[in-house]
């Protein structure tokens, strides 16, 4: 039996420049606020009142730690955060992997939620994110989340280990609903 996939009203846009690439499917491609975010894959299947008010975004975060402090992971690896849109609620489902220079690895899965009201200073986490550690050969065992009221962004932090070089990669699957 063959699997057949049909895509109705498919819109594909690709922008390739340094540290920026996105492919957008569906009506989310008409949402101009997406242009400010980097490295996203957006999926939508219609909308309630405006393009992009009900959609899913998938993006990658990365960073590098050298000690036991919290290291923020960014869209571009250095300083680009995922800024939440006004009057929108979010559910995030994240996969994180860390690999130390000696080959030891940590793998984690995290679920949580956030929302933003009418301005950047109204952003908040919804409850406490649930962290599931699948394997931790490094001995770090944690990722943390916070929000920035200065720009209304969701912040992702990996907790490193003293005197250990670790590269971090996070894949975030983010459902967003605006009203």
Stretch-by-stretch model annotation:
Residues 32-33, 49-90, 97-107, 119-126, ...:
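Surface-exposed ligand/attachment interfaces on beta-rich extracellular proteins
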Residues 1-4, 113-117:
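Assembly/interface hotspot detector across virion components, adhesins/toxins, and nucleic-acid enzymes
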Residues 2-4, 9-82, 170-173:
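Periodic small-residue-enriched repeat registers in elongated scaffold domains
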Residues 109-114, 170-172:
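Extended low-complexity, serine/threonine- and proline-enriched intrinsically disordered segments
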Residues 175-177:
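Short, low-complexity, Pro/Ser/Thr/Gly-rich segments in the mature regions of secreted, periplasmic
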């Amino acid at each position: 039996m063959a699997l057949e996939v049909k895509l109705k009203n498919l819109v594909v846009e690709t922008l390739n420049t340094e540290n920026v690439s996105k492919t957008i499917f569906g009506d989310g491609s008409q949402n101009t606020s997406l242009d400010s975010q980097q490295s996203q894959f957006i999926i939508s299947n219609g909308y309630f009142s405006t393009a992009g008010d009900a959609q899913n975004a998938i993006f990658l975060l990365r960073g590098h730690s050298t000690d036991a402090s919290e290291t923020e992971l960014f869209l571009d690896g250095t300083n680009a955060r995922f800024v939440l849109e006004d009057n929108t609620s979010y559910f995030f489902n994240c996969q994180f992997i860390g690999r130390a220079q000696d080959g030891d690895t940590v793998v984690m899965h995290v679920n949580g939620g956030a929302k933003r009201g009418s301005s950047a200073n109204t952003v908040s986490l919804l409850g406490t994110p649930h962290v599931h550690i699948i394997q931790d050969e490094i001995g770090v065992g944690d990722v943390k989340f916070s929000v920035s009221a200065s720009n209304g962004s969701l912040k992702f932090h990996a907790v490193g280990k003293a005197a250990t070089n670790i590269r971090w990669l996070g894949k975030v699957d983010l459902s967003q609903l605006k009203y």
